[in-house]
Amino acid sequence: MPELPEVEVSRLGISPHIEGRTIKSVKVHDKRLRWPVPETVHKVEGHVLRSVSRRSKYLLLQTDNGCLILHLGMSGKLRVVPAETTHYKHDHIDIEFDNGQTLRLNDPRRFGALLYSESDVSGHELLSQLGPEPLTDAFNIDYLFERSRGRSQSVKTFLMDNKVVVGVGNIYANEALFKAGINPKRAAGKISKVRYQKLVPIIKETLASAIELGGTTLKDFTQVDGNPGYFAQKLQVYGRGGKLCMVCSNRLKEVRLGQRSTVYCTQCQR
C-alpha cells in the first residue's frame, strides 16, 4: 500500500504538469473503486486546477469550484500521459487537461478512490479527524509524549493511528522504531519522554529520506515517471523477519501487532 512518502512522491511528480491547467474532462472508466465515484466529480470540468496538495495519504486537487479527493488505495499509481495514450488494464480514471495531458489512475485492486468536496475540504469526513502531518512543527516531542500518556496499546499501533499522527504506515513505523531502539510491542504510555525525544526526529528523518529516494517499491508502486522507489534498498527490518540484524547479527523476530506484520530485533530494541 502506498504510504505517505509514496503519495508525496506522486504529488511532486504530477504537480508541474497539471497545476495551473484547465480541466477539460473527468472520465471514469470504472466506478467500482473503494467507494462508487460520484457524478459530482464532473463539477471541476472547465475550471483551473489551482493546486495539488496532500493531506495524509489523500491528494487534493483544488479548483475554484471544489476539490477532487484522490486516494491510491492498496495498489494505485498515477501517470501523466498524452490524452491519446493507449489504456492499460486497470486504468480506471482519466483527468484530461487543456494542454493535452491526462492524469491517469491505474488501480488493479480497486481500493483507490475519487471523491468531490464542494466546501472547505478540511472539513470533509475523511479529513476532519486526522492528526498532524509528521513533517510539520505540529508533530513534536511534547505533542507525541502527551498523546501517549495512559495508552496501553503497543507503541507501533499507536504511531499508526492516523488520529494521533498521519502517514506513519507499517513500513516506516517498523524502520523508525528500529532506529530509535524501541521494542514495537512496548506500551506507548510506558515509554519515557527521553525515548520520545529520540523517536520523533527519527520518524521525520525516515519519512524525509523515503521521499527523497522516491518512496518504497515492494510490488505495485512506481513513481509518476515509471521508476521504482529506491528506499526499499535502505530497509533494515521491514520484510526481513527471520534474517540477521544488520547491526548486531541477532535473528530478527516477526510478530503481528494490530493485524500488521512487525519485525524487530530483540537485542537492539528494548
Curated annotation (Swiss-Prot):
It catalyses: Hydrolysis of DNA containing ring-opened 7-methylguanine residues, releasing 2,6-diamino-4-hydroxy-5-(N-methyl)formamidopyrimidine; 2'-deoxyribonucleotide-(2'-deoxyribose 5'-phosphate)-2'-deoxyribonucleotide-DNA = a 3'-end 2'-deoxyribonucleotide-(2,3-dehydro-2,3-deoxyribose 5'-phosphate)-DNA + a 5'-end 5'-phospho-2'-deoxyribonucleoside-DNA + H(+). DNA binds at H90, R109, R151. The active site is at P2 (schiff-base intermediate with dna), E3 (proton donor), K57 (proton donor), R260 (proton donor). Its EC number is 3.2.2.23, 4.2.99.18. Signal peptide: none annotated. It comes from the Bacteria. Keywords: DNA damage, DNA repair, DNA-binding, Glycosidase, Hydrolase, Lyase, Metal-binding, Multifunctional enzyme, Zinc, Zinc-finger. CDD domains: EcFpg-like_N. A zinc finger (FPG-type) spans 236-270. Its cofactor is Zn(2+). PROSITE patterns: FPG_CAT (PS51068), ZF_FPG_1 (PS01242), ZF_FPG_2 (PS51066). GO terms for molecular function: 8-oxo-7,8-dihydroguanine DNA N-glycosylase activity; class I DNA-(apurinic or apyrimidinic site) endonuclease activity; damaged DNA binding; zinc ion binding. GO terms for biological process: base-excision repair. The keyword Hydrolase applies. Disulfide bonds: none annotated. Belongs to the FPG family. PANTHER family: FORMAMIDOPYRIMIDINE-DNA GLYCOSYLASE (PTHR22993:SF9). Monomer. This is Formamidopyrimidine-DNA glycosylase. The lineage of its organism: Bacteria, Pseudomonadati, Pseudomonadota, Gammaproteobacteria, Alteromonadales.
